[in-house]
Amino acid sequence: MKRKLFWICAVAMGMSAFPSFMTQATPATQPLINAEPAVAAQTEQNPQVGQVMPGVQGADAPVVAQNGPSRDVKLTFAQIAPPPGSMVLRGINPNGSIEFGMRSDEVVTKAMLNLEYTPSPSLLPVQSQLKVYLNDELMGVLPVTKEQLGKKTLAQMPINPLFISDFNRVRLEFVGHYQDVCEKPASTTLWLDVGRSSGLDLTYQTLNVKNDLSHFPVPFFDPSDNRTNTLPMVFAGAPDVGLQQASAIVASWFGSRSGWRGQNFPVLYNQLPDRNAIVFATNDKRPDFLRDHPAVKAPVIEMINHPQNPYVKLLVVFGRDDKDLLQAAKGIAQGNILFRGESVVVNEVKPLLPRKPYDAPNWVRTDRPVTFGELKTYEEQLQSSGLEPAAINVSLNLPPDLYLMRSTGIDMDINYRYTMPPVKDSSRMDISLNNQFLQSFNLSSKQEANRLLLRIPVLQGLLDGKTDVSIPALKLGATNQLRFDFEYMNPMPGGSVDNCITFQPVQNHVVIGDDSTIDFSKYYHFIPMPDLRAFANAGFPFSRMADLSQTITVMPKAPNEAQMETLLNTVGFIGAQTGFPAINLTVTDDGSTIQGKDADIMIIGGIPDKLKDDKQIDLLVQATESWVKTPMRQTPFPGIVPDESDRAAETRSTLTSSGAMAAVIGFQSPYNDQRSVIALLADSPRGYEMLNDAVNDSGKRATMFGSVAVIRESGINSLRVGDVYYVGHLPWFERVWYALANHPILLAVLAAISVILLAWVLWRLLRIISRRRLNPDNE
């Protein structure tokens, strides 16, 4: 018996030792220009490259339940690679990468990298190759063959799912050679172009996770998921004002976590959702699928399974009444760090300190200088390495009403370190703001220059040796990108075939110090309104107070699902801009209660009757009828100071149509000249659908400006029309300069008069002094 077992094991070992045909190391690549494929397509007899144990099926796949729900995802380089999506790998910059995530409640069971690339026709076949890494683990190698040179090539590379984690980086490394001896890595013939249609095919399988709030906000929001966070909100029926406020707090908190990903909050009335969702319920008013849930005696937050699908989770916000739901919502927004178990009871949420204007966590502080370390979003953001180091980017989110008109620049103290160039050459650091070049500085080759403090002048053109950097103020907006590019000349030895100089390229390292500072504390807050661009880019004026404590939202009585969705999406968007939930937002369904209030007003659904006849309203949508005022002159870009004559309403047109339309309008509050009204209007369910799509889409929001934004099937059209008013405060002398900014001739006349008056006063003063000196007896 032992001998039989011995021979069976020997045969098995011998068969597993046969080499596998690695057909996909150089995959089926039919060039788009008529050329033969580099390698025949994989057949079922040829196992895949990357197989952990040849001959063992599925050895590189994670062990998961066979009946779990799954989804197939295709991520193209156009979606996940740095802009523009394509990559050009060169001899001195051979690496390119893409990044993707995996949710905590999912696992990848299958992954395939599809590449479309074109190698340089000057490459040496086989010696040149493309290496594929996943999280720095080699997945495979694609040799460049003679048939592929200069032709578009299609290739597939299996990715081992066992190496996929919550955050993943696929790195492509180009190994290029164009001659056997005396190569120069900087040669322009060394390149490989990877097309933006390349991508990853992934199969995700959902896991049946435990109902445990210690992982909250997972699975309702997962930071590893780069998609828009779509989170349905379920109500028993049309919510009253208290429940609207509670749901708005929850939506704004999830918006603050979603950030750049975006957010969407579909609303369901007494319907069972088909995905992870938030459910609001009281003892007396609850959806039918919770009718058997025990009554509660306090605000409770509970995580339960979907009644029909254990892979879907519901977060139930339960209370005895709307007051309990409001307390539970504030518990989610401010006490979630204490969550654990299947449910928690929110005993108390007590405010200790009030919020201050302009203190939104996502905004650069304007009360003191801010260090670059405070602006980092990940650990290694302020450093870079390579023969050509990648650019270092810093995001600056500013209040839209920061008054920078007469500023000569924003002061920055910059401390940076870098690998010294071996010789004095033209290596430099370039500084850009919002893709506009500001200035460059040479990188010195002297030892004492490793730590530099510089100043970028705004008006003069010479270095003055001071320890500041100034940014031209008028180039700043609400969202800004400050970029530092370190450009090295990288001298590389060469030679001839008979006398070749070889060398090992050494990477350059650059660092912007965390202690570098930028100072916005010297500037006033002042802005001409209405300005829908400020609302679309930063949620202003509501976001002036991050907790929306000076905002009143006017809702229709018994709002429908679309109107509730507009409320939740809007406060979610504002939360994404500020990074803080709207815990002190006021919601009302009675338009008469806003009279005399010192607050900014957000209107959803329809203009209250008392405001419909306001002369400052420039558009109104009511059922199938709508009217709009158009300006004397519409300019594509706003001036530094708004021209009120151009904005004056020339005509008013009234139309009736059955087609869907929505609009966002802004005007001055009739109850306080320092307050604003923003109204989000629609004429039909389809109109609200377009309105919500515009609020959630950053690209569409970018087209909003002026006082009116009309949303139709064709897109968004904006107008600057109607009266201009000003929000904020300027000293009297700044107001004079601001008022004269659009009138240079008047400014010159006033300047001349001022000079004449000053000269006359000085002349009179000198006459008096001279008279007293010559006639002391007259004193």
From Swiss-Prot:
Principal location: membrane
One GO CC term, this protein: plasma membrane
Pfam families on file: BcsB
GO BP: cellulose biosynthetic process; UDP-alpha-D-glucose metabolic process
UniProt membrane topology term: Single-pass type I membrane protein
Superkingdom in the source lineage: Bacteria
Secretion signal, residue range per the UniProt entry: 1-25
Subcellular localization, as worded in the UniProt entry: Cell inner membrane
InterPro entries, sorted: Cell_synth_B, Cell_synthase_bac
Annotated TM spans: 743-763
Gene3D superfamilies recorded: Galactose-binding domain-like
Keywords: c-di-GMP, Cell inner membrane, Cell membrane, Cellulose biosynthesis, Membrane, Signal, Transmembrane, Transmembrane helix
Pathway: Glycan metabolism; bacterial cellulose biosynthesis
Cytoplasmic compartment segments: 764-779
Topology feature Periplasmic, residues: 26-742
Family: Belongs to the AcsB/BcsB family.
Function comment: Binds the cellulose synthase activator, bis-(3'-5') cyclic diguanylic acid (c-di-GMP).
Note in the entry: The genes bscA, bcsB, bcsZ and bcsC are constitutively transcribed but cellulose synthesis occurs only when DgcC, a putative transmembrane protein regulated by CsgD, is expressed. Cellulose production is abolished in E.coli K12.
Known partners and oligomeric status: Tightly associated with the cellulose synthase catalytic subunit.
Protein name stated in the entry: Cyclic di-GMP-binding protein
Taxonomy of the source species: Bacteria, Pseudomonadati, Pseudomonadota, Gammaproteobacteria, Enterobacterales
